[in-house]
UniProtKB/Swiss-Prot annotation:
InterPro entries the record matches: Complex_I_Subunit_2 (IPR050175), NADH_DH_su2_C (IPR010933), NADH_UbQ_OxRdtase_chain2 (IPR003917), ND/Mrp_TM (IPR001750)
Enzyme Commission number: 7.1.1.2
Organism: Suncus megalura (Climbing shrew)
Domain of life: Eukaryota
Major location (coarse): mitochondrion
Spans through the membrane: 3-23, 25-45, 59-79, 96-116, 127-147, 149-169, 178-198, 201-221, 239-259, 274-294, 322-342
A Pfam short name: NADH_dehy_S2_C
Subunit annotation: Core subunit of respiratory chain NADH dehydrogenase (Complex I) which is composed of 45 different subunits. Interacts with TMEM242.
Underlying gene: MT-ND2
Keywords from the UniProt entry: Electron transport, Membrane, Mitochondrion, Mitochondrion inner membrane, NAD, Respiratory chain, Translocase, Transmembrane, Transmembrane helix, Transport, Ubiquinone
Protein name as annotated: NADH-ubiquinone oxidoreductase chain 2
Record localization: Mitochondrion inner membrane
Signal peptide range in chain numbering: none
Amino acid sequence: MNPMIFIVLSATIMSGTSIVLISSHWFMTWLGFEMNMMAIIPVLMKNYNPRSMEAATKYFLTQATASMILMLAIIINLMYSGQWSITNMENPLASTLITLALTMKLGLAPFHFWVPEVTQGVSLSSGLILLTWQKLAPLSLLYQIYASLNTNLLMLMSLLSIMIGGWGGLNQTQLRKIMAYSSIAHMGWMIAIMTYNPNLSLLNLIIYILMTTSMFLLLLFNSTTSTLSLSLTWNKTPIITTMILITLLSLGGLPPLTGFVPKWMIIQELTKNNSIILPTIMSILALLNLFFYMRLTYSTALTMFPTTNNMKLAWQFQTTKILPMMAPLIATSTLTLPLTPLLTLLS
């Protein structure tokens, strides 16, 4: 892709998300979503091949459907309230439709089917944008209208997302699909706490973005897309491969790594609100995620694939530069659990 075109598209993507973040008018919010969607489709098709075209088409159809439902909900809300203000949500039908539209954009269950397919069909860099930056706008809108949301609907979608995010990743060997199912599960955790403590959802989002960005940068450094190619990177960069495995365990929520912090705090907050059964089920379902991360770590770190090449230098891999931000990102996404008591200063 031409660098100038990529800069223009990136600026449009950021502008669309920024409009959603700062807008208090429903039409401007919808316009920001459309700007963002139309600009990211060429980015998804950056590697011009049938797979990326199919992924971009699936993404477009899903997002266009969600935008249509969102506009319908906005019109219904306008008919009942007579206002375009985001915080003025008086109609339960409009609130439910907006929730469905935004969860479809996020890729929560039962609207999750597009996430693994689209992520697998695009490049690692496009997948990083898809699973991090593209979550900001819908979640910011949910954050603004959390008082009007249907708690029971969100809880049902949250449990489904955590369950499908765990089950879906069990038989996967493609790392991009594993990251996609991980994203579905993490979104489920964020939505579960949205109506109780939206600030905790924001903290969960920040930690999720840090961990996912670290993981994708490490995979980009090694040009790794499958478990087989991951196991073959020991010859090239054993330290980086170790960091990949630690980051995977952090994504799974294994203590004492950073990924355990949001799960711990969400379970604590739900318990404070006299909800015992829900966090219990969520904790059990989270073990599915942790299981396939542990299995991936075991198969990569503790077993050796048969090879006919005794050469220790992996000459077939491209050499890539270590990004300056990689080290602090990895440290933040794995080692910040001891700093958790400092979060009490924010409350």
